[in-house]
């Protein structure tokens, strides 16, 4: 450890200091000295409390709620490191906000995921490290290296250790999550089912068609994030209607906004497994929700980046 402690520095904003502290601990380091607050008029204030000249800096900041505050904190911290002559500035963004605004879905829509990528690059970041982007092509929005970590192995291990038996089916809640769910199914040596959502005509409720056999099986819904949980709960109810006997759900990012917690409480889902890319506040902690840590994976990725080693080897 001693060979890199002087040149490797881990900083955090206010979005997920607990995760940042755990990552630093796995590296045998303490969080570097910084203070991120606000001035009386609401502007963000950043103070870097130690020299970063010539250092390899990793700033850990998810752009989760409050999204705009956390994004501005990240940008201002990157700018501060650049002006303080850091040798390399790595933006570690476990959850990349605005990722769902990745294309023009209708006329005159912005592509905000690209705008955010441009802002991070313009601020002075040399590299981005993130996890399970909602749209993997966002990696191409950057003109700097992007290391895209996968949460699937962490979530799959939870269910492998749980030993649910042979009657398991992995379910993709929509077409967009099929690749993620297929990886999960291969890990668990289980079949794959897909939910095909169709709206027969305008002003008519969506119909959920299930492609694959779920009758008599324990179903595991796999997605990248859970936001309001509306679609997830509808999918769980559709699976029960088609004969599934138990429903589990997992996602890398627990956004859990609006009515999500109440919906999950009242839903037929037995367990919801997420990671700690986004902190789970006390008021959202319920027995159904199980949280797995991504700190060891991010720590290993940071070490590999710092040492000039392959990051992709973590998944091969």
Swiss-Prot record:
GO terms for biological process: 5-phosphoribose 1-diphosphate biosynthetic process; purine nucleotide biosynthetic process; ribonucleoside monophosphate biosynthetic process. GO terms for cellular component: cytoplasm; ribose phosphate diphosphokinase complex. It is found in: Cytoplasm. Pathway: Metabolic intermediate biosynthesis; 5-phospho-alpha-D-ribose 1-diphosphate biosynthesis; 5-phospho-alpha-D-ribose 1-diphosphate from D-ribose 5-phosphate (route I): step 1/1. Its EC number is 2.7.6.1. Its cofactor is Mg(2+). It comes from the Bacteria. It catalyses: D-ribose 5-phosphate + ATP = 5-phospho-alpha-D-ribose 1-diphosphate + AMP + H(+). Its main location: cytoplasm. Gene3D superfamilies: 3.40.50.2020. The active site is at 197. ATP binds at residues 41-43, 100-101. Keywords: ATP-binding, Cytoplasm, Kinase, Magnesium, Metal-binding, Nucleotide biosynthesis, Nucleotide-binding, Transferase. NCBIfam families: PRK01259.1, PRK02269.1, ribP_PPkin. Involved in the biosynthesis of the central metabolite phospho-alpha-D-ribosyl-1-pyrophosphate (PRPP) via the transfer of pyrophosphoryl group from ATP to 1-hydroxyl of ribose-5-phosphate (Rib-5-P). PANTHER family: RIBOSE-PHOSPHATE DIPHOSPHOKINASE FAMILY MEMBER, RIBOSE-PHOSPHATE PYROPHOSPHOKINASE 1, CHLOROPLASTIC. Homohexamer. Belongs to the ribose-phosphate pyrophosphokinase family. Class I subfamily. This is Ribose-phosphate pyrophosphokinase. The gene is prs.
């Amino acid at each position: 450890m001693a060979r890199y402690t002087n040149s490797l520095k881990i900083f955090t904003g206010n979005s997920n200091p607990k995760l940042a502290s755990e990552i630093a601990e796995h590296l045998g380091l303490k969080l570097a000295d910084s203070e991120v607050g606000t001035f009386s008029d609401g502007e963000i204030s950043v103070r870097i409390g130690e020299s970063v000249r010539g250092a390899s800096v990793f700033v850990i900041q998810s752009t989760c709620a409050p999204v705009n505050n956390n994004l501005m904190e990240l940008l201002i911290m990157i700018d501060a490191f650049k002006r303080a002559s850091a040798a390399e500035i790595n933006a570690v963004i476990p959850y990349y906000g605005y990722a769902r605004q990745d294309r023009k879905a209708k006329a005159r829509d912005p592509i905000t995921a690209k705008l955010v990528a441009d802002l991070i690059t313009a601020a002075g970041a040399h590299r981005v490290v993130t996890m399970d982007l909602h749209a993997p092509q966002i990696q191409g929005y950057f003109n700097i290296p992007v290391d895209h970590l996968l949460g699937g192995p962490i979530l799959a291990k939870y269910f492998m250790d749980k030993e649910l038996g042979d009657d398991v089916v992995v379910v993709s809640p929509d077409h967009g999550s099929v690749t993620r769910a297929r990886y999960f199914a291969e890990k668990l040596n289980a079949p794959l089912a897909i939910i095909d959502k169709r709206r027969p005509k305008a002003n008519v409720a969506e119909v959920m068609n299930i492609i694959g056999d779920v009758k008599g099986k324990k179903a595991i819904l796999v997605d990248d994030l859970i936001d309001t949980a509306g679609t997830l709960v509808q999918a769980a109810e559709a699976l029960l209607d088609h004969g599934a006997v138990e429903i589990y759900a997992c996602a890398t990012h627990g956004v859990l906004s609006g009515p999500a917690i109440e919906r999950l409480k009242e839903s037929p889902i037995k367990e919801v497994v997420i990671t700690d890319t986004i902190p789970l506040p006390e008021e959202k902690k319920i027995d159904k929700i199980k949280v797995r840590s991504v700190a060891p994976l991010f720590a290993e990725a940071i070490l590999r980046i710092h040492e000039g080693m392959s990051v992709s080897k973590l998944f091969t």
